[in-house]
Amino acid sequence: MPGLLPDIDPDGLLEFSVVYTDRALNHMSKRFTGVVQDILGTLKEVYHAHTAVLVPGSGTFGMEAVARQFANREKVLIVRNGWFSYRWTQIFDADKGLGGGSVVCKARQQGSGPQAPWAPCPAEEVAATIRAEKPKVVFAPHVETASGIILSDDYIRTLTAAAHEVGALFVLDCVASGAMWVDMQATGVDVLISAPQKGWSGSPCCAMVMLSERARQAIEGTTSSSFSCDLKKWMQIAEGYEKGQHAYHTTMPTDALVRLREVMAETREYGFAKVRDEQIELGAKVRALLESRGFPSAAAYGFKAPGVVVSYTTDPGIQNGKKFMEVGLQTAAGVPLQCDEGPDFKTFRIGLFGLEKWHNVDRTVGHLSKALDQIAAAA
């Protein structure tokens, strides 16, 4: 007997499980099995991953799942380029028994003055620190949303080479990467973390954790310190779905994952390389616009992310987003870097994520330009 509602699972079973109602897709259904298979296949294709895992929650749930799987009571090294890579430190500090000590390589201001730009700790210096400290895991942000800093493939390769020399795993946070897809095989990344709501134009509902073959082997010798964020358990569930099998650990966000699968298919049809090119073009034009209006970039030359633009301001109404809201735009307030910045550090942040923005570069730039005109006129 088919499901009651035609938009949920028209070819499925009549819902009487103890998990869902008729208004949500059942995780045991054939339709949802196909959804998960499609998502995992796309993730492995785009990131050149050996294994893909879905962890319900958000990108931060994925970060914590990785930390609690691979870094229990182990020394770690953290590349900190702002508040959202400081999050790794917060995860370890929240459970004093989790970490075995951390070494932090912080971003640095390039030049003097409150609005001098920031660059990550030099790659060779980080690599030397890895070789000297011999951490078990190295964590780095591909794009840091507090500073707008992006790490180049060459920078990442320098760090992964050093990490592998000392037997460490290299973990790259790509939640805020947008369409700047990272090739795990080409860069040597062992664990890559993403999420649906930025680069994938989906609804927030989970973390996507990709593993290299090396990390897939390493996880077998580890035990998570979390029940709900048990990465190995979620990996086993993902591998089961790939075989057409379902299992239960905690309730999965089935309907949001359906939407994610749909937008992934839309992006593939349009072209992953094409949206990457659009992301780069949009970022360059928005950065040029802001700098022409007197808002310097917080990220130094060579490290300017195309998907997250963080700019300096001295205006509290721009910093907290109020003036943008008054003209119809939702921006993000500036946040601290936790990189020894001064008390006068003040920024605002603009996100350039999603198919609607990428496919309509000039329209997106026009929205921002008009808003800046209106803010200036009201000053």
What are these model-predicted stretches?
Residues 197-288, 292, 356:
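Active-site C-terminal subdomain of aminotransferase-like
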